């Protein structure tokens, strides 16, 4: 082993350890890179051994298991300096499935941290949807998970509620750019609705900064340089510019069509299938206030977002095109 590699390996042993759930997801993949760049070692809870090429440069420790496996949770958090809980369920066929993952598993992880890593800073990445728990089973389960974690860990826990997150690798917001390529662009949400967003790179920078700060039991969120949010015409207009559609024409999607699609989703859910659009998701989509207030905003004065809406959407589209998800 050469001297520089030996010194690096020795230094790594003394770097702080972050235990991460949900590392294989969209946000998680970006977060693991950001943690490594900030000098953290990482220990990841994954359902299976990862593809070597995906993680070879980052050299994470891997615990194979799930958030429902108490033994795996114990191996994950033992001796960790920080625990970042990203894992969650965004679609499910049954209400109890949302609660098993988004609430019960979060509580189990918090209890494990309390027992095996009591000095660790626990950071739970929740969702802005938790602010409106009556809208859907998903929102209610995220709210229940927040409350469970805060009840168990008190001031050792920080809860972060991101708004809509987009960026390279995200399949959920890909639909926005696919719609924006059309001559007639349908508006899915209410004309008066406002939606806050954040680029995934800015989100993970905020997570790292927050977990490096002392915990104090906060419940916060993050956003780009417009925390008050965007109207749907602004979001789709920016998406159209990013995909080189110079003159999109916006048309309000007929409510009857949206409700018809949602009804099909409800029927599929009753039959035990997961559907991304159902009546509950439609209520979330058409909710009029997904803005972030100044009191909720977690942004240190020296950490301005690196991406505004136009530069962030351009970055996402460039990645989609390189990856073949959007045509050139």
Question: What residues fall within each predicted segment?
Answer:
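Amphipathic terminal alpha-helices
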Residues: 2-8, 17, 292-328
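NAD(P)H-binding glycine-rich loop region in Rossmannoid oxidoreductase-like domains
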Residues: 60-104, 128-132
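N-terminal Rossmann NAD(P)H-binding glycine-rich loop of SDR-like oxidoreductase domains
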Residues: 18-38
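Conserved C-terminal active-site "lid" loop/helix of NAD(P)H-dependent oxidoreductases
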Residues: 200, 219, 261-305
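Conserved beta-loop-beta element that borders a ligand/cofactor-binding pocket
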Residues: 147-168
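Substrate-positioning beta->alpha
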Residues: 171-175, 189-211, 217-221, 233-234
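Mid/C-terminal beta-alpha module of Rossmann-like enzyme folds, strongest
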Residues: 210-276, 307-328
């Amino acid at each position: 082993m050469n001297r520089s590699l030996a010194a690096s390996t020795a230094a790594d042993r003394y770097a702080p350890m972050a235990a991460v759930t949900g590392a294989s997801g969209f946000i998680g993949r970006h977060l693991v890179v950001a943690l490594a760049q900030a000098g953290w070692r990482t220990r990841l809870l994954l359902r299976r051994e990862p593809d070597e090429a995906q993680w070879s440069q980052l050299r994470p420790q891997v615990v194979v298991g799930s958030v429902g496996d108490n033994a795996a949770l114990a191996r994950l958090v033992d001796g960790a300096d920080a625990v970042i809980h990203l894992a969650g369920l965004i679609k499910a066929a049954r209400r109890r499935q949302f609660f098993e993952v988004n609430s019960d598993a979060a509580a189990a992880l918090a209890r494990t941290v309390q027992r095996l890593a009591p000095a660790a800073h626990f950071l739970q990445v929740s969702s802005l949807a938790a602010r409106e728990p009556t809208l859907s089973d998903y929102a209610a389960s995220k709210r229940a998970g927040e409350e469970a974690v805060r009840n168990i860990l008190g001031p050792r826990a920080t809860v972060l509620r991101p708004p809509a997150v987009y960026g390279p690798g995200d399949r959920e917001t890909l639909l926005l750019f696919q719609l924006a390529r059309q001559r007639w662009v349908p508006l899915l949400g209410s004309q008066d609705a406002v939606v806050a967003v954040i680029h995934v790179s800015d989100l993970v920078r905020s997570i790292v900064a927050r977990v490096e700060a002392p915990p104090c039991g906060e419940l916060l969120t993050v956003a780009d340089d417009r925390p008050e949010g965007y109207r749907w015409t602004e979001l789709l207009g920016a998406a159209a510019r990013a995909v080189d559609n110079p003159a999109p024409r916006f048309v309000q999607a007929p409510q009857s069509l949206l409700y018809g699609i949602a009804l099909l989703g409800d029927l599929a859910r009753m039959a035990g299938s997961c559907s991304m659009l159902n009546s509950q998701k439609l209520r979330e989509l058409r909710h009029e206030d997904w803005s972030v207030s100044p009191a909720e905003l977690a942004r240190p004065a020296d950490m301005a977002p690196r991406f505004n809406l136009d530069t962030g959407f351009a970055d996402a589209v460039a990645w989609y095109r390189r990856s073949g998800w959007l045509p050139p």
